[in-house]
């Protein structure tokens, strides 16, 4: 059975970079990223490995909602300048890169789902809780920095909803980190309570007459924003990747990195 280790490139590298005392010390970054990748290979013993990078194009989410991820700090200039050299170094270690046109998350999600559907195992290396929506027994998420798999039970307890309700929660309460709006006046706690009662968005919106007038009004007025927020939070899992799995075998010969259109 194939075991595909899929690394969220900037999620890993930016956290490692943030821990380096001298922001211009790209040699230390290279050493630490190399060490991290070596450890990932040693811990997981994958048959295949890829590291997926965000691209420079404006994402379809940003086009749909211009405030998406608004206000995020840009990549530090030394890291931006040294990133290509780091990617080339990883290629010499037979860790193949995939370059997304815009956001890496959709490419990672597509890779993971395709692997799982082909009866393989996908391990996503990332701390991004958004991947928890990929609810499949052959898809897991590894937190390299805490050296543990994502604890779904703990996440569900923290969010107050089941994993299967993650997108409905984002639709109602939004996500401040990504500037996904949700419905004005509906916070995470009240959203979780509503989903505990009604289970799904569709059931909730068809049950507005059963709610108090004030809350029903908020939900009715925010219905379209909830739909937008759901779409922004939902990962694409069916991108045309046009890649050959054999090019990503662990310890295989380096090859040109593909660019994925989105």
Curated annotation (Swiss-Prot):
Summary of the function given for this chain in its UniProt record: Has flap endonuclease activity. During DNA replication, flap endonucleases cleave the 5'-overhanging flap structure that is generated by displacement synthesis when DNA polymerase encounters the 5'-end of a downstream Okazaki fragment.
Gene3D superfamilies assigned to the protein according to its UniProt record, in alphabetical order: 5' to 3' exonuclease, C-terminal subdomain, 5'-nuclease
Keywords (A to Z) from UniProt: DNA-binding, Endonuclease, Hydrolase, Magnesium, Metal-binding, Nuclease, Potassium
Protein name: Flap endonuclease Xni
Coiled coil residues, start to end: none
Binding site for K(+): 172-173, 181, 183, 186
Native source species: Shewanella sp. (strain W3-18-1)
Gene Ontology biological process: DNA replication, Okazaki fragment processing
């Amino acid at each position: 059975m194939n075991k595909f280790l899929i690394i969220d490139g900037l999620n890993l590298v930016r956290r490692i970079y943030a821990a380096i005392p001298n922001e211009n010390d790209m040699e230390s970054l290279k050493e630490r990223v190399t060490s991290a990748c070596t450890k990932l290979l040693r811990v997981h013993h994958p048959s295949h490995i890829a590291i997926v990078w965000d691209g420079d194009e404006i994402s379809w989410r940003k086009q749909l909602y211009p405030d998406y991820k608004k206000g995020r700090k840009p990549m530090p200039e030394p890291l931006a300048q040294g990133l290509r050299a780091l990617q080339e170094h990883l290629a010499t270690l037979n860790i193949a890169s995939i370059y997304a046109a815009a956001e890496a998350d959709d490419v990672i999600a597509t890779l993971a789902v395709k692997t799982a559907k082909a009866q393989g195992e996908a391990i996503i290396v990332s701390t991004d809780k958004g991947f928890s929506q990929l609810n499949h027994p052959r898809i897991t998420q590894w937190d390299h920095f805490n050296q543990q798999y994502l604890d779904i039970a703990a996440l569900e307890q923290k969010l107050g909803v089941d994993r299967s309700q993650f997108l409905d929660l984002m639709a109602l309460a939004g996500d401040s980190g990504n500037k996904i709006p949700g419905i004005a006046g509906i916070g995470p706690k009240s959203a979780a309570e509503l989903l505990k009662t009604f289970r799904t968005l569709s059931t909730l919106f068809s049950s507005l007459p059963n709610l108090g007038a004030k809350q029903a009004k908020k939900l009715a007025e925010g219905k379209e924003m909830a739909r937008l927020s759901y779409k922004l939070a939902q990962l694409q899992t069916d991108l045309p990747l046009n890649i050959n799995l054999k090019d990503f075998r662990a310890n295989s010969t380096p090859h040109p990195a593909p660019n994925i259109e989105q």
